[in-house]
């Protein structure tokens, strides 16, 4: 008789992946990375455990937005105080913090729960081509 294997955080085999965001479309890249972070690409996916892998994104400043989104897409944030609403276009947000576009897109695709917060910590985004995770020997993850 076959037994159902219950996989938890301790016996999940976490890998490290590196993704080059240069000339990649923001949403398509974010969707793939969110799936890998959640662990949905693994046959042992368990929705109540952190099964996902670690993902390093390089060249985040060179990610593409299609159409007129660079000027027209607006990101809102609120300080919590009256009159504290800030609105920034994607162009302005990219100037202030080049990694924010990718971080916001991927964060929105992961559940907003305690487990989702753990999974978000496995994402490392760098604006340039260099990263500090060479010791983990990350595999390249290709975006189709």
Swiss-Prot record:
Q: Name one GO biological process term.
A: translation
Which PROSITE patterns does the UniProt record give? RIBOSOMAL_L13 (PS00783)
Q: Does the keyword field hold Disulfide bond?
A: no
Which Pfam family is one of this chain's hits? Ribosomal_L13
- One Gene Ontology cellular component annotation held by this UniProt entry: cytosolic large ribosomal subunit
Q: Which GO terms describe its molecular function?
A: mRNA binding; structural constituent of ribosome
Domain of life, source organism: Bacteria
Tell me the function of this protein: This protein is one of the early assembly proteins of the 50S ribosomal subunit, although it is not seen to bind rRNA by itself. It is important during the early stages of 50S assembly.
Q: How does it assemble?
A: Part of the 50S ribosomal subunit.
What is the recorded name of this protein? Large ribosomal subunit protein uL13
Q: Which organism is it from?
A: Mycoplasmopsis synoviae (strain 53)
């Amino acid at each position: 008789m076959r037994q159902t294997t219950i996989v938890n955080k301790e016996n999940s085999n976490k890998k490290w992946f590196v993704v080059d965001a240069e000339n990649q479309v923001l949403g398509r890249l974010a969707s793939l990375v969110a799936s890998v972070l959640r662990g949905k690409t693994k046959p042992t996916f368990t929705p109540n455990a952190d099964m996902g892998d670690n993902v390093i994104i390089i060249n985040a400043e060179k990610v593409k937005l299609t159409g007129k989104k660079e000027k027209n897409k607006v990101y809102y944030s609120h300080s919590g105080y009256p009159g504290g609403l800030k609105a920034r276009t994607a162009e302005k947000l990219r100037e202030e913090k080049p990694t924010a576009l990718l971080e916001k897109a991927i964060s929105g695709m992961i559940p907003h729960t305690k487990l989702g917060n753990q999974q978000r910590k496995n994402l490392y985004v760098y604006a340039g081509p260099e990263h500090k995770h060479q010791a983990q020997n990350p595999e390249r993850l290709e975006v189709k």
